UniProtKB/Swiss-Prot annotation:
PANTHER family: TRANSCRIPTIONAL REGULATORY PROTEIN YEBC-RELATED, TRANSLATIONAL ACTIVATOR OF CYTOCHROME C OXIDASE 1. It is found in: Cytoplasm. GO terms for biological process: regulation of DNA-templated transcription. It holds the Pfam family Transcrip_reg. It comes from the Bacteria. Its main location: cytoplasm. InterPro entries: Integrase-like_N (IPR017856), TACO1_YebC-like_2nd/3rd_dom (IPR048300), TACO1_YebC_N (IPR049083), Transcrip_reg_TACO1-like (IPR002876), Transcrip_reg_TACO1-like_dom3 (IPR026564), YebC-like (IPR029072). Keywords: Cytoplasm, DNA-binding, Transcription, Transcription regulation. It comes from Legionella pneumophila (strain Lens). HAMAP family: Transcrip_reg_TACO1. One of its GO terms (cellular component) is cytosol. This is Probable transcriptional regulatory protein lpl1249.
Length: 247
């Protein structure tokens, strides 16, 4: 479990750095627009939109920018029609990788994703080739200075499937359908949540060598830098040495 949460923290910090450069804003606006188009502009009844808005606020996006993206989504007529796509493949060392995209041009997107895999020792697979190795779940991360017994009791009572304390962090895993119930229960109890999101979580992590990790990180970075890519997931278990070097 520690491998999951540490990697999530690294991705979170990288996301904040990217946001300062303006790189991530395009992806966030795209996700907000699509979420509003699919489920309406009311955050209280649209979990996907609520999560997208939270990510945008965490990246210091202005509320006016967020509201405009929601309006475009609800209006539906303006802008390109974005389609959600998922690509599956293998990275260096046979690591399973999922790539979630939003794009208005499938041919462009698959070409760019395939190129990234090929350039860094991986290969694009077929639908279903690795997705069975992942489960869609909610992940909530909290600082360990929160009252652990209280956190555990509230989370489990609200429907969490697992709660663990690793290093300086409490990690809570939920089924998708219980994610917002658990999150709201924690927040209603005035407990501080550091990060929360729906994710594709590897059922089993695969240990990889540091050499393989370096190649894999280059692949993941290249995929995440593509405009059409929203999220990248893998089942790699990185060594403490690699995780520390990325902090």
């Amino acid at each position: 479990m520690a491998g999951h949460s540490k990697w999530a923290n690294i991705k979170f910090r990288k996301g904040v750095q990217d946001a300062k450069r303006g790189k991530i804003f395009t992806k966030l606006i795209r996700e907000i627009t699509v979420a509003a188009r699919m489920g309406g502009g009311d955050e209280s009844s649209n979990p996907r939109l609520r999560d997208a808005v939270k990510k945008a606020l965490n990246a210091n996006m202005k509320r006016d920018t967020i509201d405009n993206a929601v309006k475009r989504g609800v209006g539906g007529a303006d802008g390109e029609a974005m389609i959600a796509m998922r690509y599956e493949g293998y990275g260096p060392g046979g690591v399973a990788i999922l790539v979630d995209c939003l794009s208005d041009n499938k041919n462009r997107t698959v070409s760019e994703v395939r190129h990234a895999f090929s350039k860094h020792g991986g290969n694009l697979g077929t639908d279903g080739s690795v997705s069975y190795l992942f489960t869609n779940q909610g992940e909530i991360l909290m600082a360990s200075n929160q009252p652990e017994d209280k956190v555990m009791e509230i989370a489990i009572d609200a429907g969490a499937s697992d709660v663990a304390v690793e290093d300086s962090q409490i990690e809570i895993i939920t089924p998708v359908e219980a994610y917002h119930t658990v999150l709201n229960a924690l927040q209603d109890a005035a407990l501080e949540v550091e990060q929360s999101h729906l994710t594709m979580r590897a059922q089993t992590l695969v240990p990889i060598s540091d050499e393989t990790a370096e190649s894999l990180i280059k692949l993941i970075d290249m995929l995440e830098d593509l405009d059409d890519v929203q999220e990248v997931y893998s089942n790699a278990e990185f060594s403490e040495k690699i995780l520390e070097s990325m902090n």
